[in-house]
Amino acid sequence: MYDYIRGTLTYVHTGAIVIECQGIGYHIAITERWAIECIRALHQDFLVFTHVIFRETEHLLYGFHSREERECFRILISFSGIGPKLALAILNALPLKVLCSVVRSEDIRALASVSGIGKKTAEKLMVELKQKLPDLLPLDSRVETSQTHTTSSCLEEGIQALAALGYSKIAAERMIAEAIKDLPEGSSLTDILPIALKKNFSGVNKD
């Protein structure tokens, strides 16, 4: 029904965004990983590729940063026992390129590590994904990746993102500094922010 929605990104929450387009605010479920990255685009023009699920009482929108990721989502929800929430959880834990690698190497343990998927489900899903691998491989090869050093600009963006969530500059700087200690060189902002927020739950406040 909708290929994509383009408008102003007005709200970012854990696993969801709101895009205003022609006076209508579209609530769109996305991965938590991408939601963290979306914070930087608040109040800016934004495009998201969408998948709509129609139910008797509601229409649910799911969003993706690329058509390739959306196609992977559609492949996942075609499997018995995999609903949209679990499919998003899989893509959150195992982004498209990683998921393709997991399937190629038949890494059952990695797939079973996703919350909501046990070993038996992972084994069954792996068999089905292997059958779909010809569909996934072209997507994997088209996904652009970049390995960059953790630059000062990246750290500054992290501080700004935390500030947008209500953290003071001092708290944000401390959280980012602690997070990068646990990450390898070349980590991106998408890697840094989840660690920073996780550490916050262990005792860092917003002040």
Swiss-Prot record:
Keyword Nucleus: no
GO CC terms: cytoplasm; Holliday junction helicase complex; Holliday junction resolvase complex
Chief location: cytoplasm
Entry annotated with the keyword DNA damage: yes
Pfam families according to UniProt: HHH_5 (PF14520), RuvA_N (PF01330)
GO molecular function per UniProt: ATP binding; four-way junction DNA binding; four-way junction helicase activity
Positions of the UniProt region annotated as Domain I: 1-65
Positions of the UniProt region annotated as Domain II: 66-144
InterPro entries cross-referenced by the UniProt entry: DNA_helicase_Holl-junc_RuvA_I, Hlx-hairpin-Hlx_DNA-bd_motif, NA-bd_OB-fold, RuvA, RuvA_2-like, RuvA_C, RuvA_C_sf
Region (Domain III): 150-207
Subcellular location: Cytoplasm
Notes on the domains: Has three domains with a flexible linker between the domains II and III and assumes an 'L' shape. Domain III is highly mobile and contacts RuvB.
Quaternary structure (record): Homotetramer. Forms an RuvA(8)-RuvB(12)-Holliday junction (HJ) complex. HJ DNA is sandwiched between 2 RuvA tetramers; dsDNA enters through RuvA and exits via RuvB. An RuvB hexamer assembles on each DNA strand where it exits the tetramer. Each RuvB hexamer is contacted by two RuvA subunits (via domain III) on 2 adjacent RuvB subunits; this complex drives branch migration. In the full resolvosome a probable DNA-RuvA(4)-RuvB(12)-RuvC(2) complex forms which resolves the HJ.
Protein's UniProt name: Holliday junction branch migration complex subunit RuvA
Native species: Chlamydia pneumoniae (Chlamydophila pneumoniae)
Designated gene of the protein: ruvA
